[in-house]
Regions:
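Short glycine/proline-enriched coil/turn segments at helix->beta-strand junctions
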Residues: 21, 97-101, 128-132
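Conserved beta3 VAIK motif of the Hanks protein kinase fold
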Residues: 104
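Conserved protein-kinase N-lobe ATP-binding Lys motif
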Residues: 108
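Charged helix-capping and loop-helix junction motifs
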Residues: 117-121
Length: 161
C-alpha cells in the first residue's frame, strides 16, 4: 500500500464525485441486486477514466481507459492470481491499474452488516499488498439514512480514512 499523496487523494476524490454526481447512478437501488448496479457503474467509472486520460493529454484516452480499467468477471483481463486469505481469494468489483492500483468495492445496504462485509473485503485488498488504495462505494438503503449519518462518528471515520 502506498502512502497517500495529494495527487492520489485528488484522484480518488474526483472519482468519487464523478460517480455520485453522475445522472447514470441509480439513486433507488432496492429493486436491483448488486450485480445489476455494478453493470450500471461500469460506464460511469469508464467515463471518469477517459476524462482522466484526456486531462493527462493522452493521444487516445479511450484506449487508456480500456487498458487500465477492469471489472469482476471480465474475461481475459487482469487475471493475476490474488493473494489468498482465510482459504479463499478476494476479487474486487472493479480495478484501476493506472495511475494507481485501486480496488473498487460496491455495496448497497439497509443495515450495517453488508457495509462491514464491504469494509472487510476492502481490508483484505489492502493487506494483500496488490493494491495501493481501495475505494468502497456504499449506497445507504436504510429509511433514515443511518449508515450515511454514522460516518460522522469517530470510530467509523477512523475506519474509512
Amino acid at each position: 500500500m502506498k502512502p497517500k499523496s495529494q495527487k492520489s487523494i485528488k484522484f480518488i476524490e474526483e472519482l468519487h464525485k464523478h460517480i455520485v454526481r453522475s445522472p447514470l447512478l441509480r439513486k433507488n437501488v432496492q429493486n436491483k441486486n448488486e450485480s445489476q448496479i455494478q453493470t450500471e457503474l461500469r460506464p460511469i467509472i469508464f467515463d471518469y477514466m477517459v476524462k482522466h486520460f484526456q486531462n493527462q493529454s493522452w493521444k487516445n484516452p479511450e484506449s487508456g481507459a480500456k487498458k487500465y480499467f477492469y471489472w469482476e468477471g471480465q474475461e481475459g483481463r487482469h487475471t493475476k492470481i490474488k493473494t489468498e486469505s482465510f482459504a479463499s481469494r478476494n476479487y474486487p468489483d472493479f480495478i484501476i491499474t493506472n495511475p494507481y492500483m485501486i480496488a473498487i468495492e460496491y455495496k448497497k445496504s439497509g443495515s450495517g452488516s453488508i457495509v462491514k462485509q464491504g469494509l472487510g473485503q476492502s481490508l483484505m485488498h489492502t493487506l494483500g499488498g496488490e493494491f495501493d488504495f481501495v475505494y468502497c462505494l456504499i449506497q445507504d438503503e436504510s429509511q433514515n439514512k443511518k449508515i450515511v449519518k454514522s460516518i460522522k462518528n469517530e470510530k467509523e471515520n477512523i475506519i474509512i480514512q
